[in-house]
Amino acid sequence: KIMNIRDIKRKKITEMTTDEILAERKFYEDVIANCKYEKPQDIADLFEAYTMLIWKHKQVGRVYDFYFDGLKEERDGGDNLEGSDHVVLDTLRALARTPDLNVVFEEIHCIGNPKDGFRFGQVVWNDATTVDGVGPDGPGSGLGYEDREDLEMCECWIRKIDGKWRVAKEASIRSNAAYKRVLG
């Protein structure tokens, strides 16, 4: 049976069958493997694929495939990150607290070209609970986000660095009240 990837995309990984998980993962892996880096839509699709593999499918090591080691990520509230190692650490911390996290893309728009690089903006919301999570203060609270309560917006600059396309800079803002309510 051929699956429609759009039907399973919004499901949390904990709600998916093994066949659905493997089909979705293969879909995103194919997007990455076949990216031509020629048009803005190529980059938008690529970033969505990386995001879903890193966050939903817990392939955190893929950060090293796409993020520049000298990355600077500017966040609202001043909790900035520098370097891909810090992005990995921050991602692992978040996933430990919300193991059922699912990122839902509302919109992603990209501009640019292969000569000058690309720039995109995206809006996502997170669907997650802390029921099975563990944080610095122990077991999770069991709280979860309401639909579209934890909105995140980010803008990324993609450049060719040492012959490879990488996220060179990222700026992000999120719904801090929801984040603090659920994660403390």
What does each model-found stretch correspond to?
Residues D45, V60-V123:
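A solvent-exposed, acidic/Ser-Thr-rich amphipathic alpha-helical stretch
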Residues D42, H86, E149-D150:
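Soluble or luminal CAZymes and related metallo-dependent hydrolases
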Residues M3, I54-K56, V60, Y64, ...:
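A compositionally biased, intrinsically disordered/low-complexity signal enriched
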Residues N4-N34, L92-G184:
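A beta-strand edge to alpha-helix "cap/lid" segment located at domain peripheries
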Residues I2-G61, D65-D69:
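Short, low-complexity N-terminal intrinsically disordered segments enriched in polar/charged residues
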